[in-house]
Every structure is written in structure tokens, then in C-alpha cells.
Amino acid sequence: MNKIKPKKRLGQHFLISKNVIEKIVDEINISKEDIIVEIGPGTGALTEEILLRNPKILYAIEIDTSVHPVLEEKFSIYSNFKLIKSDFFDVNLYELISDEEKIKLVGNLPYNVASLMIIDCAFKLDILEFCVFMIQKEVAEKLIAKPKTKDYTFLSVFIQTFFDIKYVMSVPARFFNPPPKVTSAVVKLTPKQNIAINNVKKYKNFISHLFQNRRKMIKSKIEEEMLNKAGISPNLRAEELSVEDFIRIFGVVENDDR
């Protein structure tokens, strides 16, 4: 296993702290009925702890061909372990479950695509029980940011629309191989119920549009008549609006488009 070198191009930093691994798996709260999907298992440190807790099945999605033999050998004794040799974005999670089953999605996400992976989760709400991710602390702070703060961005609004977010803990660089140049964090994302957004892709584009030139007043992006219908001052900037404000404006715009 020591021969496996983390690949910079894949944004790999392997978690090596047993204590942190156990805390992450505690947060997953595994039962024997659970279907767990792990993104980027690497050499299997988190994978091993998950399997020790005996879920119904663990699918490990790994793009790096150099670790495939390591994972296959290490976990060959587990009948509930399935390795998917693929890019996460090419895997259809819906094919891994039966009707009404849900997935616990976990992983130490590659820093270079973590935000894209989290955004992708908003398009799979109906099959996710929750997500537990290790990500860059800077990204985690954006996920939980409030209006009128520097960390409040498109990502904050979009993800807070669809998920309740728990900041579990910070993880120093020394707990990884190689140590990243930044601090990491563990977050838990639980899908909200009864979300008033029917077209997630359109909503995503809408939020992204409003956050372009975030210091500009929103009346430069949305007709004042629409803003008045939504009960929003046209002189506000995107960074000053709450998640509820964005949802309300989008609802008015959607109705007008019909």
C-alpha cells in the first residue's frame, strides 16, 4: 500500500488519522440496512472503517486505476463491497438502488472537483438520505455562510436551498498524506423536505446569474415589477438576499415565464 502515491492531478490527499476516520463514520451512523456509496476511496482507510460497521452494501467509486488492485485485494473478504471503476460523474446512482431505497453518500472529496460534486447532489435529492463529505474548509465555510458576508456566494444559496448543513469538524493538514496546503472540514448535508423548486437546473442558472457582479443591485438583473411582486427591494444586492428571498424571486419569475 505504501507504493501508492497520491496523484496531484486527481486532487488526492489520503486521510491517515484513525481518530478522524472513526468520527466521520460515527456521523454516518451505519445500520445493516444501509446502502452506502463512497466517492474516491483511495487506498481504503475510510472504506475499511465503514465495512467494519457492516452496512448492507458499500459501493466504492474510484477513478484511479492504480488503486483498484489494492482495494480489490484488501476487501476481497467482504461480500458487501463493490468497487466501481469509474469517474463519479459517469455513475448513475439510480441504478444502484431499488424503488424507495436511499443512499448515504460519503467521501473524502478531491479538492479540485468538490464543489461540482456537491452541486451534483442537488439533482439527486430523491435518492439521498444524506451526504457526509470531507472538503476544503474554505468550501465548507461557503456552504454555511450567511448573507452580507464575504463567504456568501452562489454555492451558499444553491446548496442551502436544498440541504440542511451541519459543520461537523475541522481537520488539520497533518492528518493527510500528502498534507494539503489548506485545512479541511467534514460536513453533513441532509436533504430538506418539501422544497418549492421544480426545475433545479433552471434555479441553478438563475442563482448563478444573480451572483455575477455580486455588488450590482438586483434591479440590473431582474425587472423591478417582478421584484415588487416578490416583496424584494430592487436596490438590494445578491449578497444581501436570504435563501428564502432567492426562492421567492425565482417563483415569481417562473410563474411569469409560463
UniProtKB/Swiss-Prot annotation:
Quote the subcellular location field of this record.
Cytoplasm
Please give the PROSITE patterns that the UniProt record associates with this protein: RRNA_A_DIMETH, SAM_RNA_A_N6_MT
Q: Which SMART domains match?
A: rADc (SM00650)
| Entry-linked Pfam families | RrnaAD (PF00398)
The catalytic activity of this protein is classed by the Enzyme Commission as: 2.1.1.182
Q: Chief location of this protein?
A: cytoplasm
Q: Which InterPro entries match?
A: KsgA/Erm (IPR001737), rRNA_Ade_diMease-like_C (IPR023165), rRNA_Ade_Mease_Trfase_CS (IPR020596), rRNA_Ade_methylase_Trfase_N (IPR020598), rRNA_adenine_dimethylase (IPR011530), SAM-dependent_MTases_sf (IPR029063)
Tell me the name of the encoding gene: rsmA
Note whether Transport occurs among the keywords: no
Q: Member of which family?
A: Belongs to the class I-like SAM-binding methyltransferase superfamily. rRNA adenine N(6)-methyltransferase family. RsmA subfamily.
Return the protein name: Ribosomal RNA small subunit methyltransferase A
Q: Name one GO cellular component term.
A: cytosol
**Biological role:** Specifically dimethylates two adjacent adenosines (A1518 and A1519) in the loop of a conserved hairpin near the 3'-end of 16S rRNA in the 30S particle. May play a critical role in biogenesis of 30S subunits.
> What highest taxon heads this organism's lineage?
Bacteria
Q: Where does S-adenosyl-L-methionine bind?
A: 13, 15, 40, 62, 87, 108
Q: Which reaction does it catalyse?
A: adenosine(1518)/adenosine(1519) in 16S rRNA + 4 S-adenosyl-L-methionine = N(6)-dimethyladenosine(1518)/N(6)-dimethyladenosine(1519) in 16S rRNA + 4 S-adenosyl-L-homocysteine + 4 H(+)
Which GO-annotated molecular functions does the record name? 16S rRNA (adenine(1518)-N(6)/adenine(1519)-N(6))-dimethyltransferase activity; RNA binding
Keywords annotated in UniProt: Cytoplasm, Methyltransferase, RNA-binding, rRNA processing, S-adenosyl-L-methionine, Transferase
